[in-house]
């Protein structure tokens, strides 16, 4: 199934039913009085988190959803039936945004959680409601109120405990295959991974955590180059990041340079995301046969990054060191959960960090969307509205060229 993590939809709640003007008419009963009933309320629209879904592809082509209208009132004081509510299932981890105001309406992070996104219209009143001591035969009614209509943007962020960072071919997919039952595609060319992959890692008999593998980052990713920028947002809700570095690249490039690229692009995308707990994982060390060279490369990466956090040396292909790493991750997650329960200040600091990451990620992606809209309309920037040839060659010297992948 195709992975879709952003869609725009239009929702329209049902209108309320109209009130009825009616009078009682029976044999031998003169001037029976009003008996027009009220209309029914319009149906509302809800989004519900469904644990069985992992993509928004169902909303890629069907984008308009209307709830049922309330029925009109009937005679004999009969109230019209209420319109049926419409419940739209979405994956757990979906953020709902008002497309016009960019206001966050809600976040569906728990299975079964339900969020109203469009309120059904209020019912109209029948003429019975307007009877009084001075007006015994009212001819006044009210129509039903229109249902709420909204343009929504749905954003899916996968819910994972651990996120994998690295250049293409750093071994992220091989790592997730080594520690879980997930089987993402693995090949010896860049961008083998095109969409996020999730794997459940079992530690012992009763404990487990979820790992998210996103497409590799490249130089200029924060400005839109490559694939990774679209999926960096999925790391916003992870609890720990694993920075994988290919220590034996086929092109014989410097692993320290590759590590710097990831740190730099991560900071450009979201400075707050760099404050997330991050561990350095040096992969493919089994391909370096000389122990002295192995230690030298390891030390070069650590010194170049000024790294002071945990460092792990592994071979994802041979599964060497992966079990110890998984156990340490599980231990960290357990300790983190316990500290969140016991230390309110720590919990508050993490909540603030999470919010900053969400805000920065959304602002960066919105800026890229705006830039793409300008380019599609034939504008290279806001000050060059008269450029009709849509040629961006003069920009090539100022930074990376931006490629958009559908």
UniProtKB/Swiss-Prot annotation:
Localization: Cytoplasm
Residue ranges occupied by any Obg domain in the UniProt entry: 1-159
Pfam families linked: GTP1_OBG, MMR_HSR1
Keyword Nucleotide-binding belongs to the record: yes
Ranges annotated as biased composition (Acidic residues): 385-399
Bias (Polar residues): 129-143
UniProt xrefs under CDD domains: Obg (cd01898)
GO cellular component: cytoplasm
Primary residence: cytoplasm
Binding site for Mg(2+): 173, 193
Region named Disordered: 127-148, 378-406
One MF term in the entry's GO annotations: magnesium ion binding
Statement: the UniProt record of this protein carries the keyword rRNA-binding: no
EC number: 3.6.5.-
Keywords: Cytoplasm, GTP-binding, Hydrolase, Magnesium, Metal-binding, Nucleotide-binding
A biological process from GO: ribosome biogenesis
UniProt-annotated binding residues for GTP: 166-173, 191-195, 213-216, 283-286, 315-317
Listed cofactors: Mg(2+)
Domain OBG-type G: residue ranges: 160-334
Family indicated by similarity: Belongs to the TRAFAC class OBG-HflX-like GTPase superfamily. OBG GTPase family.
Function: An essential GTPase which binds GTP, GDP and possibly (p)ppGpp with moderate affinity, with high nucleotide exchange rates and a fairly low GTP hydrolysis rate. Plays a role in control of the cell cycle, stress response, ribosome biogenesis and in those bacteria that undergo differentiation, in morphogenesis control.
The protein's assembly and partners: Monomer.
Protein name from the UniProt record: GTPase Obg
Organism: Pseudomonas paraeruginosa (strain DSM 24068 / PA7) (Pseudomonas aeruginosa (strain PA7))
Lineage per the UniProt record: Bacteria, Pseudomonadati, Pseudomonadota, Gammaproteobacteria, Pseudomonadales
């Amino acid at each position: 199934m195709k992975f879709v993590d952003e869609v725009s939809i239009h929702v329209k709640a049902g209108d309320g039913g109209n009130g009825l003007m009616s009078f009682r008419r029976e044999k031998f009963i003169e001037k029976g009085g009003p008996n027009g009933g009220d209309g029914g309320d319009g149906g509302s629209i809800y989004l519900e988190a469904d644990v069985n879904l992992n993509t928004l592809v169902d909303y890629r082509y069907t984008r308009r959803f209307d709830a049922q209208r309330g029925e009109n009132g009937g005679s004999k004081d009969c109230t019209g039936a209420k319109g049926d509510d419409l419940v739209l299932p979405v994956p757990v981890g979906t953020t709902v945004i008002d497309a016009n105001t960019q206001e966050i309406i809600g976040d569906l992070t728990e299975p079964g959680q339900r969020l109203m996104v469009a309120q059904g219209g209020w019912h109209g009143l029948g003429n019975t409601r307007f009877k009084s001591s001075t007006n015994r035969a009212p001819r006044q009614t009210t129509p039903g109120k229109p249902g709420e209509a909204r343009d929504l943007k749905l954003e899916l962020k996968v819910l994972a405990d651990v996120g994998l960072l690295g250049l293409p071919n750093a071994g992220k997919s091989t790592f997730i295959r080594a520690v879980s039952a997930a089987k993402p595609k693995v090949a010896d060319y860049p961008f083998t991974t095109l969409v996020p992959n999730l794997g459940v890692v079992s530690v012992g008999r009763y404990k487990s955590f979820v790992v998210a593998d996103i497409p590799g980052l490249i130089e200029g990713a924060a400005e839109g180059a490559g694939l990774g920028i679209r999926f960096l947002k999925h790391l916003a809700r992870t609890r720990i990041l694993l920075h994988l570095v290919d220590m034996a690249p086929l092109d014989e490039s410097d692993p320290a340079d590759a590590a710097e690229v990831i740190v730099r692009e991560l900071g450009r995308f979201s400075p707050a995301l760099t404050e997330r707990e991050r561990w350095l994982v040096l992969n493919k060390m089994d391909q370096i046969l000389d122990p002295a060279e192995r230690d030298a490369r390891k030390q070069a990466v650590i010194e170049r990054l000024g790294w002071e956090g945990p460092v792990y040396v592994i071979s994802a292909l041979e599964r060497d060191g992966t079990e110890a790493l998984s156990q340490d991750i599980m231990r960290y997650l357990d300790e983190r959960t316990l500290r969140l329960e016991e230390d309110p200040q720590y919990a508050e600091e993490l909540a603030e960090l999470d919010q900053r990451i969400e805000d920065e990620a959304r602002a960066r992606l919105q800026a890229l969307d705006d830039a793409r809209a300008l380019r599609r309309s034939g504008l290279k920037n806001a000050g060059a509205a008269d450029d009709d040839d849509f040629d961006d060659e003069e920009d090539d010297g100022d930074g990376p060229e931006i490629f958009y992948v559908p």
